[in-house]
Amino acid sequence: VLNELKDKPGVSVDERMADLAVAVGRTLHPEGTALFVEPGTRLGGTLTAKLRETALEEGLTPVAPCPHLGPCPLLETRERRWCHASQLAVAPAWLADLARYAKLPKDSLSLSFMQLRPESEAAPIAKTALFPAMDPNGVVARILSEAFPVPGMGHARYACTEDGFAIIPAAGDIPSGALVACRRPASPRKDAKTGAVELLWQPEQKPQR
């Protein structure tokens, strides 16, 4: 994992990720793919986002989890948020016992990841292939958060899109980390806390992984 790369005195995280992106670009097979998986912590999300940024400069394309090839909105925002997804998981018995003793729940697994391919082999997410009945002017969003209550929006979730950081109302039923088809409302609201712009997901289009 990226957080276990050996530190070098005087070398920043950005420089470490740039060196790694160069190495991946030089060694990756033209039809290959490289997958980096981190714990779903703030550090893990920052490392994968920094790797993505430098990988693009080296001619690599992030094919997952990113639904676009633009700048990462989470690197641009001042909010302490990061790209990660959670899913239910069953811990080994010894870990479950320890978690109960420490009063730390271990019923889910949170990960940050980045999948890279050579630019010539990668293709942007095809909206019509994933969501045949999607609004032609719509946008694909990657869910980034658990559901949380927002006045006037029900249980909302944050998401990453080609338009930037977004908030999706009434999203309690969407799985964490899923890709969803959304449409842009005529008069989108903004999240007062983060400035995320409102998108409306199309529930008739099944969320994808």
Where are these regions (language model features)?
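A short glycine-rich, Lys/Arg-flanked "PGG" loop and its adjoining helix->strand segment in the class I
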Residues: 12-36
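C-terminal lobe and adjacent flexible extensions of AdoMet/dcAdoMet transferase-like proteins
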Residues: 82-209
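Conserved beta-strand segments of the P-loop GTPase G domain that flank and frequently precede/overlap
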Residues: 4, 35-38
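A short SAM/SAH-binding and catalytic strip from SAM-dependent methyltransferases
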Residues: 1-14
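Conserved strand-to-helix beginnings and helix N-cap segments that scaffold or border functional pockets
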Residues: 14-17, 45-49
